[in-house]
């Protein structure tokens, strides 16, 4: 599968204007291509896809994700595409580690995966293996970092799940709690 991605440095004001465009997924149905918008999981959107063939194949997937956190937060993660039609959550694709403080543009020309038009098969895009230089317990995200593309006649929703956050050891070593304790002692005296 050919994958291209880039991270773009743009002022927040420009990126804010693009948020209404959202992320888009191009699906191939029979002989026709159709764009499907992907919105955050806290939004509900319905897209009518003309089912002219027996299978839907995923190709020319283009995803644009605006910054999820402040650039200064230094949070990075890998974007996974998973088929969650069963409990295994089969991995369809995984990118290298990306900076979540910058705009991410991901393009995949071919995805070796097809879906029967008669089945309920959700495909999930989500950031996993998150890394942060901050201590545990700090609130990293203000929005949910997962999107869903599902084929279903009924309303389909995923159960909430917490993403595991891993921390960079090198960044934590830089923090010296002994100096902080000493300064607190000095100020109290």
Swiss-Prot record:
Single Gene Ontology MF annotation: RNA binding
Subcellular location: Host membrane
Superkingdom: Viruses
Alphabetically ordered keywords of this record: Host membrane, Membrane, RNA-binding, Transport, Viral movement protein
Pfam family for this entry, one: TBSV_P22
GO cellular component annotations of the record: host cell membrane; membrane; viral capsid
Gene Ontology biological process terms in this record: transport of virus in host, cell to cell
Family listed: Belongs to the tombusvirus/aureusvirus movement protein p22 family.
Role: Transports viral genome to neighboring plant cells directly through plasmosdesmata, without any budding. The movement protein allows efficient cell to cell propagation, by bypassing the host cell wall barrier.
Protein name from the UniProt record: Movement protein
Species of provenance: Artichoke mottled crinkle virus (AMCV)
């Amino acid at each position: 599968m050919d994958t291209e991605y880039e991270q773009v440095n743009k002022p927040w004001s420009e990126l804010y204007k693009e948020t209404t465009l959202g992320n888009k997924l191009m699906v191939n149905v029979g002989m026709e291509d159709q764009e499907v918008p992907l919105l955050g999981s806290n939004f509900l959107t319905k897209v009518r896809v003309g089912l002219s063939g027996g299978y839907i194949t995923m190709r020319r997937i283009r995803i644009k994700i605006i910054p999820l956190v402040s650039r200064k937060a230094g949070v990075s993660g890998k974007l996974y595409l998973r088929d969650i039609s069963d409990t295994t959550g089969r991995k369809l694709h995984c990118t290298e580690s990306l900076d979540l403080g910058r705009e991410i543009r991901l393009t995949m020309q071919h995805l070796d995966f097809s879906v029967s038009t008669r089945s309920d098969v959700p495909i999930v895009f989500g950031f996993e293996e998150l890394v942060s230089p901050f201590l545990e317990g700090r609130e990293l995200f203000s929005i949910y970092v997962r999107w869903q593309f599902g084929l279903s006649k009924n309303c389909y929703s995923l159960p909430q799940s917490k993403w595991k956050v891993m921390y960079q050891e090198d960044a934590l070593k830089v923090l010296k709690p002994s100096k902080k304790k000493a300064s607190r002692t000095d100020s109290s005296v």
